[in-house]
């Protein structure tokens, strides 16, 4: 999922995610820097830009934003004064015993992806929580 969202954050160009920018060996005085690895171009620049705009509204739209805190009148996910492009998701969890899906309130897989700053993202964070013990609308 993280790799797929790199295409949205990079104007349609999918990159291999980098978790570490560089590794420094202070004893040897050397630095090894990660190189950008292009995987493909699955979406157009326009589609990526429009998707990011829709993702901004997920956190900023008071009526339809699923990650907008109506009681406080602000986005749930905030990073300084930056607009954050976000998308949340909920999925069913298979029940291995019955071959069907679990049906309890907390028997779900919840996820959120955030890109900051939304116009030209430098960072993407993708978090999943499977079958949370407790739950509220603010994650």
Feature annotation, model-predicted:
Residues 1, 47-54:
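Stable alpha-helical elements in mature extracytoplasmic
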């Amino acid at each position: 999922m993280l790799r797929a969202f790199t295409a949205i954050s990079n104007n349609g160009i999918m990159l291999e995610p980098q978790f570490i920018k560089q590794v420094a060996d202070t004893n040897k005085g050397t630095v090894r820097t990660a190189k950008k690895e292009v995987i493909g171009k699955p979406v157009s620049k326009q589609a990526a830009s429009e998707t990011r705009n829709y993702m901004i509204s997920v956190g900023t739209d008071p009526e339809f934003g699923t990650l907008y805190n109506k009681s406080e009148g602000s986005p749930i996910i905030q990073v300084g004064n930056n607009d954050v492009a976000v998308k949340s998701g909920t999925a069913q969890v298979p029940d291995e015993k019955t071959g069907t899906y679990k049906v309890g309130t907390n028997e779900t897989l919840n996820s959120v992806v955030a890109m900051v700053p939304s116009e030209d993202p430098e960072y993407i964070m993708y978090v999943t929580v499977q079958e949370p013990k407790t739950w509220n609308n603010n994650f």
